[in-house]
UniProtKB/Swiss-Prot annotation:
Subcellular location: Endoplasmic reticulum membrane; Lipid droplet
Name this protein carries in UniProt: Lipid droplet assembly factor 1-B
GO BP term (any one): lipid droplet formation
Sequence intervals crossing the membrane: 43-63, 66-86, 88-108, 110-130
Keywords: Endoplasmic reticulum, Lipid droplet, Membrane, Transmembrane, Transmembrane helix
Ranges in the topological domain labelled Lumenal: 64-65, 109
Chief location category: endoplasmic reticulum
Similarity comment: family membership: Belongs to the LDAF1 family.
Record flagged with keyword DNA damage: no
Entry's Gene Ontology cellular component terms: endoplasmic reticulum membrane; lipid droplet
Domain of life of the source: Eukaryota
Native source species: Xenopus laevis
Length: 162
């Protein structure tokens, strides 16, 4: 069991080293450095929820914006064929549709970002609790009770009864 944990720990350390090397490569790029030193980059660095919301919004809006630009290019060809009135109507309707889609995506990206943040906080709390519990149980098995006033949790009671 200890060797599996050691192997897992070594793999995680190797992965952390690779991730740090990758992040250094990105951060050493001159354009990234210029962006991070700009007021907008500093604002995003100080507000991670806004950054996550913006990332989700941009990721989700690429396809509708691409479809809109394809539609605009297709209607531009139709202009060459003298269909000016139809083009104006189609671009107006598609522009309104794009506006509606992007507004919906903006609201959805805020919700997704909020869910991701809550999941991260809840997950890290659970993992921290599990780790603290495993450390406490392991310490108690090796050296006796941790304290005289220790009250057993429901999980400890179920473990001791089985």
């Amino acid at each position: 069991m200890a060797s599996a944990e050691k192997l897992y720990r070594e793999k995680m350390q190797e992965l952390q080293k690779q991730l740090n090397k990758f992040m250094q490569t990105i951060n050493n790029h001159s354009k990234v450095d210029a962006f991070l030193n700009s007021p907008f980059g500093q604002y995003l660095d100080e507000h991670p929820f806004v950054t996550l919301s913006l990332l989700v919004f941009v990721s989700l809006s690429v396809v509708p914006a691409g479809l809109f630009l394809t539609l605009v290019a297709g209607t531009a060809i139709a202009v060459c064929l003298a269909v000016l009135i139809i083009e104006g109507i189609v671009i107006s309707v598609s522009g309104i549709a794009l506006l509606c889609i992007l507004c919906g995506l903006a609201v959805m990206s805020l919700g997704v970002a909020a869910i991701l943040c809550v999941s991260y906080v809840a997950g890290s709390s659970v993992f921290n609790y599990m780790h603290a519990y495993r450390v406490a149980v392991g310490t108690r098995e090796r050296s006796g009770p941790i304290s005289l006033n220790h009250k057993m949790t429901m999980a400890e009671k179920s473990l001791s009864s089985s």
